[in-house]
Swiss-Prot record:
It comes from the Bacteria. Residues 1-196 are annotated as: CPSase. Composed of two chains; the small (or glutamine) chain promotes the hydrolysis of glutamine to ammonia, which is used by the large (or ammonia) chain to synthesize carbamoyl phosphate. Tetramer of heterodimers (alpha,beta)4. The keyword Ligase applies. Residues 197-384 form the Glutamine amidotransferase type-1 domain. The gene is carA. This is Carbamoyl phosphate synthase small chain. It catalyses: hydrogencarbonate + L-glutamine + 2 ATP + H2O = carbamoyl phosphate + L-glutamate + 2 ADP + phosphate + 2 H(+). InterPro entries: Anth_synth/Amidotransfase (IPR050472), CarbamoylP_synth_ssu (IPR006274), CarbamoylP_synth_ssu_N (IPR002474), CarbP_synth_ssu_N_sf (IPR036480), Class_I_gatase-like (IPR029062), CPSase_GATase1 (IPR035686), GATASE (IPR017926).
Amino acid sequence: MEGVLSQLAVLVLEDGTKFHGRAIGAKGITVGEVVFNTSITGYQEIITDPSYSHQIVTLTHPHIGNVGTNSNDEESSKIYIKGLIIRDLSLTASNYRNKKSFSSYLKENNIIAISDIDTRKLTRILRTKGSQNGCIIEDKKQNYSIAYNKAKNFISLQDLDLAKKVSTKSIYNWDQGSFTFKKNNFFSINKQKFLFHVVVYDFGVKRNILRMLVDRGCYLTVVPAITDPKTVLNLSPDGIFLSNGPGDPRPCDYAIHAIQYFLKTNIPIFGICLGHQLLALASGAKIVKMKFGHHGGNHPVKDIKNNRVIITSQNHSFTVDTENLPNNIEITHSSLFDGTLQGLSLTNKSAFSFQGHPEASPGPHDASYLFDYFIKLIVSQKTTLSN
């Protein structure tokens, strides 16, 4: 059971709105862009998603921490969020996989967090006014003026290259598949039994993305975001995967140029989230900042090609502008919430992308068929080359 949460804390937004609560994480002060996530489950996966770099995440579900934490549910090697805002911290964790309480996990990872916040009110403010910068101070004095000034002066995430900061610094291989509850472990495949070799550009990749590719017979080489395209081609990949990641894709010139280089070849390309936006930019489309973004596991998306609706996991603050799209871009998916572009394919290349997270974690797996389509493109290309 958690100890008594007696330390006071304050959250202040850049418009001057303040919320008083209790500190449930590390001591200190933090500042970032405040966003909200509507997922009911998967709080550990959310806070370890590199896509949340430089952001303070508000979880709209009222009860957080009830299943504790464990290392198997981490989506990366560290926590990238700037801070966490919740309504109520569960004082007990009831799950056979629990290894550590959520509050202890936050403190151990030096994450400042605040509870006892009216998250419904906060979410309404963000929906009405758009995402705002905010500051959390864990302090008995709850110094409002310091928090307000820090929130007011925090840098905008627009035109900021965050992918380079969260990306791996060296090339590595990955052969771990999905978690199997029967064996209570992740399965792995002998390298000789893999069917395909896929190079993954790490712009902030989640582990479950890698696992779902391995599940489909892919041996993975994960490369840094700034990797030269010639280095990738020397690895002789059967396919290239462009991962998720944080922030604005527009400053990532190195990635855009690399993708344009790959589009001159016939190697199948699949991008998600930030990778989707980078493929769009490389193909001549434009990107715009959204009012408050899409963050949650309940977003309905229409699959235009197959005329069906899928429920998806989403986490992005930028979107592809649908006005004046290049002729070779075909819209394959659209949001049923606001009509924004959710998927595209290039009519003249074996390249496609999806704005949401088909790997979920957390969220539904309705869009996992996109991984199968990627494999289908790889098989088709290998068949063409062998004939």
